[in-house]
Amino acid sequence: MKYAFFLGCIMPHRYPGVEKATKIVMEELGVELEYMPGASCCPAPGVFGSFDQKTWLTLAARNLCIAEEMGLDIVTVCNGCYGSLFEAAHILHENKEALDFVNEKLDKIGKQYKGTIKVRHFAELIYKDIGVDKIKEKVVKPLDVLNVAIHYGCHFLKPSDVKHLDSPERPKLLEEIVAATGAKPVMYRDYLMCCGAGGGVRARFLPTALDMTKEKIRNMLEAGADCTVNVCPFCHLQFDRGQVEIKEKFGEEYKLPVLHLSQLLGLAFGMKPEDLAVSVHAIPVDPVLKKLGIE
């Protein structure tokens, strides 16, 4: 399997370790990821789409065109990028007026969107195409001592009427992937609540965003979580860097380790922590490594 790898903004600039972890984990699972030359911001659906939908749609379509030129479907590890590109492709498929408008703009840079590719989230790809049985086969370091609080995020499952990935209210997809590593997914209060960062809230109303993050982290800890696992670098940033900001603004310290799903899988596959770049997180992951007996 080969896919066009859409990086987005947060991962390469703030968490390049997630990028590396994704590359080597997917390689282990038989998936080749090829970088997309000239790709831009997705762009962020909650920001661009709110102010100017036509501009958002045109920029997203340009990224889709790059993958079409490569002859590859897109895979991304970011919920926001997935939401933006998937929903743009859906609109362009369903709305000829929007397609004509976008292609008129794209024609000026020598591109045309044809609608020949699909947009995939890497967790969806793992679950639907690779399968949890393959994950189990690849596990060399069972994570059976680890209690994991899963964070789905907002754009992964919704809008559910067009994505059809899983139940938007009682999902199980990530639980099954995490459980395949031997780790125990733990249920906690407000399980599907936003991390607090999305929709421009972090950028404009940081205290409000941190209040939401703080509530989620408290709930995770009360449920006995050793760490939280996400499938979105922006959510990852909010939980990881957000804990530092919570201490600075509210004087409250939590220290809940934060892992992207690719990093959790990498640990289960026996990959070295330094290859997964977990040491560069704002909140130390050492308690997780110590519990797993990893030096």
UniProtKB/Swiss-Prot annotation:
Pathway: Cofactor metabolism; coenzyme M-coenzyme B heterodisulfide reduction; coenzyme B and coenzyme M from coenzyme M-coenzyme B heterodisulfide: step 1/1. One of its GO terms (biological process) is methanogenesis. The keyword Glycosyltransferase does not apply. GO terms for molecular function: CoB--CoM heterodisulfide reductase activity. Belongs to the HdrB family. Part of a complex that catalyzes the reversible reduction of CoM-S-S-CoB to the thiol-coenzymes H-S-CoM (coenzyme M) and H-S-CoB (coenzyme B). This is CoB--CoM heterodisulfide reductase subunit B 2. It comes from Methanocaldococcus jannaschii (strain ATCC 43067 / DSM 2661 / JAL-1 / JCM 10045 / NBRC 100440). The lineage of its organism: Archaea, Methanobacteriati, Methanobacteriota, Methanomada group, Methanococci. The gene is hdrB2.
